[in-house]
A protein has these predicted regions:
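Loop-helix junctions at membrane interfaces
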Residues: 1-205
Length: 205
C-alpha cells in the first residue's frame, strides 16, 4: 500500500511539473499561449485549455493552485513584456491578474470531477471544464476591472478605444467578450479530446 501511495505521489508531482513547464512555455514564447489579433488589446490565450486539462486530471484544489501559477505569469508578463497599455492597466494589478486565474482553475476542476459521476457523459464534463476555465477567467477579469477602475475609468476606457460617457462595464464586455467567446469555444471543444485519453493512460500506471 505504501508503494502504491508513493507511486501515486510521484506520478502527481510528475504530471504537475510537466504541466507547469507547458504553462511557462505558453506564457513566455510569443504567439504560443497568447496570440495578438488586435494590437493594443489583450491577446487571445490558449492557456485556459491547459488549465482545464490539468484541473480535470487533478481536481479543484490543484486546479486552483495551477490557476494561481498562470496568474503569476500574467502579472510578470504585464511588467516584463506587456503587449499594450490595456495589459499594463489590467494585469499589473495583482487582484485582476491572480484572482480570475485561480477561480478559473478551481471551477474547471469542479467540472472535471463530474466525469466520475457522469460515466456515459464524460466528454460533456470535460467540455464544461474547458468552457468554465475560459468563461470564469474572462468574466472575473471584466468585473474586477470595472470594480478597480469604477472611480477613475477614463484612462482604461480610452486605452480600449471607447468614447467618453460610455459605461466602463459595457466597454469591457465589448472589448473582451469576443476574445472570451473564442477562448471558451476552443477550450470546450479540445479539452475532452486531450483529457479523456490522458486520464485513461494515467490510470494504467
Amino acid at each position: 500500500m505504501y508503494d502504491s501511495e508513493a507511486r501515486q505521489k510521484t506520478l502527481n508531482l510528475t504530471v504537475s511539473a510537466v504541466f507547469v513547464a507547458i504553462l511557462l512555455l505558453e506564457a513566455f514564447i510569443p504567439n504560443v499561449g497568447y496570440i495578438t489579433i488586435l494590437p493594443g488589446l489583450p491577446a487571445i490565450t490558449t492557456i485556459p485549455l491547459t488549465v482545464a486539462v490539468f484541473a480535470s486530471l487533478r481536481g479543484p484544489k490543484a486546479g486552483a493552485a495551477f490557476g494561481l501559477v498562470w496568474g503569476l505569469t500574467s502579472l510578470l508578463r504585464a511588467y516584463a513584456a506587456p503587449n499594450g497599455l490595456v495589459t499594463i492597466l489590467l494585469f499589473q494589478n495583482p487582484l485582476i491578474a491572480l484572482l480570475p486565474r485561480l477561480a478559473a482553475g478551481w471551477a474547471a476542476g469542479l467540472a472535471g470531477q463530474l466525469a466520475d459521476k457522469w460515466e456515459s457523459r464524460k466528454p460533456l464534463a470535460y467540455a464544461l471544464s474547458g468552457l468554465l476555465a475560459s468563461a470564469v477567467n474572462t468574466l472575473m477579469v471584466i468585473l474586477l476591472s470595472d470594480l478597480v477602475y469604477f472611480s477613475h475609468p477614463q484612462k482604461l476606457a480610452l486605452a480600449l478605444g471607447a468614447k467618453s460617457g460610455q459605461s466602463l462595464l459595457v466597454i469591457l464586455f465589448t472589448a473582451l467578450a469576443v476574445n472570451g467567446i473564442l477562448e471558451a469555444v476552443f477550450s470546450g471543444l479540445i479539452t475532452p479530446l486531450i483529457t479523456a485519453p490522458l486520464k485513461k493512460r494515467l490510470k494504467r500506471r
